[in-house]
């Protein structure tokens, strides 16, 4: 695993662009390393089910002998989570060797491959939309902590609420 700094604006737009750590708007992420040989992992557009190229942010889908089969007694949730199929693959796909009709696990994790390593940027369910722009809660929390010495890092949380909370 390694730490890499990305252009925060481009990352929010779904593109991983590496920058120096001291660049304005740089956002640091630590990789999860490479994918185990027994596992296949692809980054997919969660709306279309199409595989995305390295450097694009999408949902991680997994396939392998160590992936569960489903949720006990919850067939609908099992189909939604463990029954995904790739709508389109890239040339030299990370799904190479996996049959086209194979079921994939939708992890709900967002991230990308960059430099051959896997980076997780957040969770789909945690993503917030402000003025039509996708925002990670961690970014809001870091901005609040950086805004004032009175706010301690790790003591701020951002989340959505069904109604306006003031």
Mark where each language-model region is.
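Hydrophobic, Leu/Ile/Phe/Ala-enriched alpha-helical segments that form helix-helix packing faces
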Residues: 1, 55, 144-148
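Gly/Ser/Thr-rich phosphate-binding loop
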Residues: 1-26, 40, 47-51
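Alpha-helix initiation/capping motif
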Residues: 7, 115, 122-123, 148, ...
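Alpha-helix termini
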Residues: 18, 86-90, 148-153
């Amino acid at each position: 695993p390694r730490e890499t700094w990305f252009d925060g604006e481009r990352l929010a737009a779904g593109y991983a662009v590496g920058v120096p750590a001291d660049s304005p708007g740089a956002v640091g992420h630590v990789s999860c390393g490479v994918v185990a040989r027994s596992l296949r992992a692809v980054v997919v557009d969660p709306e279309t089910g199409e595989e995305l190229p390295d450097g694009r942010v999408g949902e991680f889908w997994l396939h392998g002998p160590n992936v569960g089969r489903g949720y006990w007694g919850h067939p609908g949730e099992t189909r939604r989570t463990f029954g995904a199929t790739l709508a389109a693959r890239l040339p030299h796909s990370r799904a190479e060797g996996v049959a086209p009709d194979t079921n994939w696990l939708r992890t709900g994790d967002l991230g990308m491959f960059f430099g051959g390593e896997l980076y997780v940027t957040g969770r789909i369910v945690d993503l917030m939309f402000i003025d039509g722009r996708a925002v990670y809660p961690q970014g809001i929390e870091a901005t609040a902590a950086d805004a004032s010495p009175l706010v301690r890092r790790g003591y701020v949380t951002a989340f959505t609420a069904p109604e306006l909370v003031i």
